[in-house]
Amino acid sequence: MPKKSIEEWEEDAIESVPYLASDEKGSNYKEATQIPLNLKQSEIENHPTVKPWVHFVAGGIGGMAGAVVTCPFDLVKTRLQSDIFLKAYKSQAVNISKGSTRPKSINYVIQAGTHFKETLGIIGNVYKQEGFRSLFKGLGPNLVGVIPARSINFFTYGTTKDMYAKAFNNGQETPMIHLMAAATAGWATATATNPIWLIKTRVQLDKAGKTSVRQYKNSWDCLKSVIRNEGFTGLYKGLSASYLGSVEGILQWLLYEQMKRLIKERSIEKFGYQAEGTKSTSEKVKEWCQRSGSAGLAKFVASIATYPHEVVRTRLRQTPKENGKRKYTGLVQSFKVIIKEEGLFSMYSGLTPHLMRTVPNSIIMFGTWEIVIRLLS
């Protein structure tokens, strides 16, 4: 066997690097994945290192953008969840299936269409009777809540995900790591922002009784009234339901991470391992749209699975009756009272406007979050 020169050995070694760097374990050299030598491991895994403050800022901006666009649907959802507006906005969808010989699936589709039509009708009525600005009632406290809530959520999730991965799984992410990080983020966010959401709910339900006199001049007046009449603990009404509601956020993060992983795997199958800088603009936009859409789909599934807690939380945050007595005093008690007096179906009151708000809200929020992260990183 003739001896190779140093140059020949060097050339063979360089040609073998892409094969050795890939995960291929087979013997077919030509099918080995070509990985650029200057590609960092973080870029290969599509988990670039992002500073915590970037998550904080990007989450706040994303949450603000989504909240402003979808505020009218949030107003309708809150009113439909409250028993104060129960008679005024009673849906006709429940009567569609009565005495009907149509298949259940057809009835469900018709009911969904009815809810959609009624939601738009309620928005129209609010606009006619209360004015355009009323469609954005509660936006102030909503933004005051959304911006820190999303900042805290994205910051805590991103930070604890990296921390848990390094502490428990040698830096590798798994669904269990995502679960732990999402739970931590959900509980931290709920505790920090519950007073803001309570004020926002009270303001949106104001001017809802038999009298047309407003109880609160503004959010600040509402805050002072709650502290004066109910004490500081009154600001944490509905916190137990918020903790229960963190399950929705946990489920959304889990689904989003798994769908994002599938999108990345399909990208690798099609293009191979590529650094983000080497992809064309159209490829980047397409993957961004897919990831944003995944956030919306994840929110859709999570919302349907966990929606009843939203109704209970709204009832717990309502202003006490004129005699000072609270109808809804606790999580379990509220579930029992609502189901007994209004039926199981009422646990999904306001679901249609909720989905019409949260799904596009998630798409806008996560999409904006990714854009801001790329700009700041």
Swiss-Prot record:
Disulfide bonds: none annotated. Gene3D superfamilies: Mitochondrial carrier domain. It catalyses: 5-methyl-UTP(out) + UTP(in) = 5-methyl-UTP(in) + UTP(out). GO terms for cellular component: mitochondrial inner membrane; mitochondrion. It is found in: Mitochondrion inner membrane. The chain crosses the membrane at residues 53-73, 131-151, 179-199, 238-258, 286-306, 347-368. The keyword Transport applies. PROSITE patterns: SOLCAR (PS50920). The keyword Transmembrane applies. Coiled coil: none annotated. Keywords: Membrane, Mitochondrion, Mitochondrion inner membrane, Repeat, Transmembrane, Transmembrane helix, Transport. GO terms for molecular function: pyrimidine nucleotide transmembrane transporter activity. Belongs to the mitochondrial carrier (TC 2.A.29) family. Mitochondrial transporter that imports/exports pyrimidine nucleotides into and from mitochondria. Selectively transports uridine, thymidine, and cytosine (deoxy)nucleoside di- and triphosphates by an antiport mechanism. Also transports, with lower efficiency, uridine, thymidine, and cytosine (deoxy)nucleoside monophosphates as well as guanosine (deoxy)nucleoside di- and triphosphate. This is Mitochondrial pyrimidine nucleotide transporter RIM2. It comes from Saccharomyces cerevisiae (strain ATCC 204508 / S288c). The gene is RIM2.
